Amino acid sequence: MIPGEIQVAEGVIELNVGRKTVKIRVENTGDRPVQIGSHYHFYEVNPALSFDRELTKGFRLNIASGTAVRFEPGQGREVELVEYAGTKTIYGFRGEVMGKLVGAE
């Protein structure tokens, strides 16, 4: 092995297999870019992003960990969200959900 070399296993890595997903259309109605990280609770993103928020409670972007999606002013696009796993207990973000999601198993 060479110092700094990364060795990876062969094959395809599948993310979030078997998890519930939803696709929604999102538009940035603001005058500044908005960037959303991979694990941010989508329901609580910047209010300048226009979409059906109720559909997104308990979901985050279905993208690789540590990555993000950026919305330029006036830009709209469809994104895929994936449901949080585990106890579905959410704290922080914008403080709109502070605890276990209602109806979470």
UniProtKB/Swiss-Prot annotation:
Domain of life: Bacteria
Family: Belongs to the urease beta subunit family.
One Pfam family named in its UniProt record: Urease_beta
Catalyzed chemical reaction(s): urea + 2 H2O + H(+) = hydrogencarbonate + 2 NH4(+)
PANTHER family: UREASE
Summary of subunit composition and partner proteins: Heterotrimer of UreA (gamma), UreB (beta) and UreC (alpha) subunits. Three heterotrimers associate to form the active enzyme.
BP-aspect Gene Ontology terms: urea catabolic process
Coiled-coil blocks: none
Statement: the UniProt record of this protein carries the keyword Hydrolase: yes
UniProt protein name: Urease subunit beta
EC number in record: 3.5.1.5
Main subcellular location of this protein, as a coarse class: cytoplasm
Involved pathway(s): Nitrogen metabolism; urea degradation; CO(2) and NH(3) from urea (urease route): step 1/1
Entry keywords, A to Z: Cytoplasm, Hydrolase
One GO cellular component, as annotated: urease complex
GO molecular function annotations of the record: urease activity
Subcellular location: Cytoplasm
